[in-house]
């Protein structure tokens, strides 16, 4: 592995640059873009793949990090499919022509005719401004306006280009502000050629099952074993063929290449991401702070007995430390209803949630993402005592008069308390794989978080396998060590 050094200034910005790439005349350029796709098609990561293809051909450009795929607040109703923005961090001698190229490429290749509202921001500098980093953190769990983004863009002298209503600049700014210096994962995404977009994707299911079994837990959410579903392929008309998510770039690459597809692909690229980190649920809230479309978690006490709705959905209510109450919805596809319906008043829980806004026929509701049962309340039933002689149940003699066995004539004043055994236990409960959002943290990742760099000497990008142009996945090259 090559030797790398990390300057103190770069360490603060969580940007690691190899020592041989830190020439005096290289500037660090951060390129962020979002909202280039629509429900009808295209994909922001695909544009990142194509832009990277261009940048890799330029001798004066060096990547200082993997391309970043940053998933933002998944509860935003006007988001495109995955609410993912992209950031490319490069070292270069000349920024102006790169910015012009990316700006023009995004304006030409975004799905504007179908409602895309792309935004592109470019910032030069080693250290990302604090205001941009805070904006990025907020974008993970709250609603931010275009005006919020524009104020920071102006104050920090960030170059910004937008089309349509320009909402993409919100995600673009958030992307360059997310440094992923803490937990993160990787995803190797393969892309279809233009002529194949919209046609059925063909994958060998047995190879996917084998790959998943061999690589778990270094890869995750490849399949939903309970419902027998493949999870690595999207279902829409976008150019993504499949994506393998995991803990390190080598494993996701080897896993992708093992699938041996017959379809000729445009290529593939590895992203460093915040997927699978629960990054949107790390802010603790009280109900007085809750607003529509926010995400977070709250600790509270069950204050209303759960009840099951038609279709298997479950509703219950919890109160927080201020004794404010909120209804909680547990939808059938999550498979959490079987746990939620067994809660009783007085149980202490943590819940991760997204906020559904109030509408004509329902109030504001917390949509459950995870349930942590911290303390189960005891359920005690009072029964008439047993006769110590014949072991039959005694009869009440009347209010305040105690109990008597009708056969043995033995009397007692004491009632008999029975603690009911609960069918659930204290612990952490997560929805089924098929209901996971991009940001949902799988159970096996708790306690296995990554840091960056997580090995001596960062994995550079590009490397022998992290970017590949046109061919079959089985036209693979040997995965060499970095």
Residue ranges and their predicted role:
Residues 98-108, 112-289:
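Long, hydrophobic alpha/beta structural blocks
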Residues 257-305, 310, 339, 372, ...:
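OB-fold nucleic-acid-binding modules
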Residues 295, 334-351:
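Short nucleic-acid-contacting surface segments enriched for D/E, G, S/T with interspersed K/R
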Residues 298-303, 345-361:
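Flexible glycine-rich surface loops and low-complexity tracts that mediate binding to linear polymers
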Residues 305-333:
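OB-fold (S1/OB) nucleic-acid-binding surfaces
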Residues 344, 417-482:
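Long, charge-rich boundary regions
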Residues 356-384:
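OB-fold/S1-family single-stranded nucleic acid-binding modules
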Residues 387-390, 405-408:
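Short cysteine-rich clusters marking metal-coordination/redox-active sites
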């Amino acid at each position: 592995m090559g030797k790398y050094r990390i300057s103190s200034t770069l360490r603060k910005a969580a940007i690691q640059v190899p020592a041989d790439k830190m020439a005096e005349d290289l500037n660090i350029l951060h390129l962020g873009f979002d909202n280039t796709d629509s429900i009808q098609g295209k994909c922001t990561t695909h544009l990142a793949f194509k832009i990277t293809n261009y940048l890799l051909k330029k001798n004066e450009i060096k990547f200082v990090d993997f391309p970043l795929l940053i998933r933002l607040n998944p509860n935003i109703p006007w988001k495109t499919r995955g609410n993912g923005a992209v950031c490319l961090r490069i070292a270069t001698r000349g920024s102006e022509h790169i910015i012009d190229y990316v700006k023009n490429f995004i304006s030409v290749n975004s799905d504007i005719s179908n409602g895309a509202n792309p935004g592109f921001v470019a910032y030069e500098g080693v250290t990302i401004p604090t205001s941009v980093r805070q904006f990025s953190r907020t974008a993970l769990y709250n609603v931010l306006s275009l005006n919020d983004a524009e104020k920071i863009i102006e104050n920090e002298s960030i170059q910004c280009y937008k089309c349509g209503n320009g909402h993409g600049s919100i995600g673009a700014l958030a992307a360059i502000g997310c440094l992923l210096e803490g937990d993160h994962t990787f995803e190797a995404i393969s892309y279809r050629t233009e002529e194949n977009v919209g046609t059925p994707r063909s994958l060998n299911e047995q190879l996917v099952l084998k790959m998943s079994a061999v690589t778990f837990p270094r890869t995750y959410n490849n399949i939903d074993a309970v419902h027998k579903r493949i999870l690595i392929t999207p279902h829409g008309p976008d150019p993504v063929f499949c994506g393998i998510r995991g803990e390190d770039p080598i494993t996701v690459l080897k896993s992708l290449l093992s699938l041996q597809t017959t379809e000729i692909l445009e290529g593939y690229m590895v992203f460093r991401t915040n997927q699978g980190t629960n990054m949107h649920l790390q802010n603790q809230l009280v109900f007085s702070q809750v607003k529509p479309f926010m995400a977070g978690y709250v600790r509270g006490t069950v204050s209303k007995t759960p009840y099951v709705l038609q279709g298997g959905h479950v509703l219950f209510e919890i109160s927080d430390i201020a004794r404010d109450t909120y209804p909680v919805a547990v939808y059938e596809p999550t498979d959490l209803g079987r746990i939620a319906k067994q809660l009783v008043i007085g149980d202490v829980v943590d819940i991760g949630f997204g906020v559904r806004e109030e509408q004509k026929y329902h109030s504001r509701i917390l949509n459950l993402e995870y349930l942590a049962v911290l303390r189960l309340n005891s359920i005690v039933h009072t029964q008439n005592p047993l006769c110590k002689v014949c072991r039959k149940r005694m009869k009440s003699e009347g209010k305040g008069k105690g109990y008597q066995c009708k056969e043995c004539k033995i009397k007692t004043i004491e009632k008999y308390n029975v603690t009911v055994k609960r069918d659930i236990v204290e612990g952490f409960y997560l929805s089924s794989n098929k209901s996971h959002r991009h940001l949902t943290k799988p159970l096996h990742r708790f306690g296995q978080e990554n840091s960056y760099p997580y090995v001596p000497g960062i994995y550079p990008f590009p490397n022998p396998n992290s970017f590949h142009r046109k061919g079959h996945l089985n036209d693979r090259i040997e995965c060499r060590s970095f």
